[in-house]
């Protein structure tokens, strides 16, 4: 995305956090990042927020964007089909569209009122040439 001219607030490399102990250890960083994003949303005239994966953090960011009437395209939507549907209402309310990476997710989200579109899985584009 950066190569296409999108301004990144933070790179995915710094947000790849798995496991409760790692999240707790990175909590001060995540809180500072959330404050930074809130300030940017308030002061920069941002047109679109594209959160990528990481629902533990990004679900709060989509709420911030929604309250400021900033459009949200959530790429790699939360796996509510696996972890429970409690996030669907917020996704419906706070996103303009979801870019989903598994074919079945498009129908799953659409039947629940979300504007979803299957865009393919980024790893499949990389793996397919290896198998040929």
Which residues make up each language-model segment?
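Active-site and donor-binding regions of nucleotide-sugar-utilizing enzymes
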Residues: 1-131
